[in-house]
Design a protein with these regions (language model features):
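N-terminal alpha/beta PP-like core and its mobile active-site loop of ThDP/TPP-dependent enzymes
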Residues: 1-233
């Protein structure tokens, strides 16, 4: 069946299905098909940054405020490298950021043939600061890779994850996945403490002379409960 739906369209629709309404970054020759698809859908606002570093910080800030997925688009090679400082901060802060970067055509990637902005081990570079770094290696596995990356970013401990989408694959026409009709990220439900664990914790707090409440990134969604505990004195 003929279709005009591309991997770039898949990226745009996937982000919408994840609840993303704003993305940040820099337009380049290696990510234009994805950004064009976002423009055609007209459901996600693209905020152009002055540079990839700023775009990564913007995505980090968006994730912190929205308590959802922050997204930055960059070019390949130097463009992806420029985002590293912001992604490192997102990793340190536990912010769920999805970094989507272009990559040179699959026939040239990793072959050191001098293709435009063909970086040496870009996956290794991004993996050094992110929770994970992945490449879309075929049009058929694009949705799976994006889903894995988003779930990893949003799973405790949250943090940035990078995905490469080679420029030739961005333009490949595919059948629209029917699963996107009612798509929900397969996030694991937070662990609920048992009554016995809660009783033990309560006993320790009551017995403590000067209790200290030290909350980490895993308690980001528990602000109300933490405030209630503090108010109990």
């Amino acid at each position: 069946m003929a279709t005009d739906y591309t991997v770039g369209d898949l990226v745009a629709e996937f982000l919408s299905a994840c609840g993303v309404t704003t993305v940040f970054g820099i337009a380049s020759v290696h990510n234009i098909p994805m950004l064009d698809a976002i423009g055609r859908r007209n459901s996600i606002r693209f905020m152009m940054a002055r540079g990839e570093l700023g775009g990564a910080h913007m995505a980090d800030g968006y994730a912190r405020v929205s308590q959802g997925l922050g997204v930055i688009f960059s070019s390949t090679g130097p463009g992806a490298a420029n985002a590293i400082g912001g992604l490192f901060e997102a990793r340190f802060a536990g912010s769920p950021v999805l970094h989507i970067t272009g990559q040179t055509s699959t026939r040239y990637a990793d072959r050191a043939m001098g293709s435009v902005h063909d970086p040496y081990d870009q996956l290794g570079m991004m993996g050094s600061v992110c929770k994970g770094a992945y490449r879309v290696r075929s049009a058929q596995n694009a949705l799976g890779v994006l889903t894995q990356a988003a779930v990893e970013a949003l799973s405790a401990p949250m943090g940035p994850v990078s995905v490469e989408v080679p420029i030739d694959l961005q333009r490949v026409k595919i059948e629209r996945p029917a699963v996107l009709d009612n798509f929900v990220l397969p996030l694991a439900a937070p662990r609920v403490p048992t009554d016995a664990e809660l009783d033990e914790l309560a006993a320790r707090v009551v017995a403590a002379r000067r209790p200290l409440l030290w909350l980490g990134n895993g308690a980001k969604q528990a602000g109300g409960a933490a405030a209630k505990l503090l108010d109990m004195g």
